[in-house]
Amino acid sequence: GDETMTTILQLSDLHIGPHNDEKDQKTYDLIHHMMTHYQPDITVLTGDQIWSEGVIDSGRVYKKLMEYLNRYDTQIATTFGNHDTEGHLKRSDLRAIEDQYSTNYVQKNHSLIVDDKEAYTIEVVNNDTVTHVLYVIDGGDYNPFGIGDYDFIRPEHVNWLRETHQAYQTRFQHNFQHNLLFTHIPLQEYREVENIGEYHGIFNEPIACSKINSGLFSQMLLNGDIEGMFCGHDHDNDFTINLYGIRLSFGRVGGYNTYGDLQRGARLIELQPDAIYKSKVLEFDDRF
């Protein structure tokens, strides 16, 4: 393929359960298909990798997933959703499992952990030059005040986005324009789909964002380097809208052991230096 092309596979909402049943096996089949057919350079798991509520040994399930992913020639990156740490394990426990058992985990840069939620960057390199920065932010799980259902990105992480962008500007003396951001829970701004009316893809359920808007989108606009954002969480959405020059996308639900009417799949993102990224939804033909 193209030497300067970097491909990213977004796997979201795999929802692997503790019983290794037929549904989970299909999820593993989907992962295998996507890895072997598309051979992504980087694979980003955008949350709800596992079920954990009432699961005694969710750590074993997560370890199995990490070990399974070791067989592929890709770099693994993760963030967490609202279902990964509802049991005994904290996010720090899941990160420890990644550290211990994942042999192809991506190099994290500029890591900042706030309330056990991590933000970090991935540096995409072409010909010894960093051409893109991928920002990964853990948006948490449930609202700490019981306001609505879901958590919001912490102000410290919004500030981190500003400072980290500044650090890259200073380090490279270069204006990045094609960077991306990954998180689990959609921002409130995704709701603009209802006002814009113009979108690509499927919009089949209300946007399950936080009731609190902590201003991440305003910082994305101010930085001016982020061209696209990707989340998961809403299994019946996979649309993209262009909001004030930033494309906001859902992935495609990948897990069989969970709700949702969409054909299971993933999202493929293609990066090239000095070009707008390309992205498409991939479906897994699971009829056989």
Regions found by a protein language model. Name each.
Residues 1-65, 70:
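N-terminal active-site segment of His-dependent metallophosphoesterases
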Residues 6-18, 131-141, 182, 247-253:
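Active-site-proximal beta-strand elements of phosphoester/diester hydrolases
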Residues 13, 31, 43, 48, ...:
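Divalent metal-coordination and catalytic microenvironments
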Residues 19-23, 47-67, 85-104, 193, ...:
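Metal-dependent catalytic neighborhoods of phosphoester/phosphodiester hydrolases
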Residues 38-42, 133-136, 148-238:
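His/acidic metal-ligating clusters that form di-metal
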Residues 61-174, 267-272:
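Extended active-site neighborhood of metal-dependent phosphoesterases/phosphodiesterases
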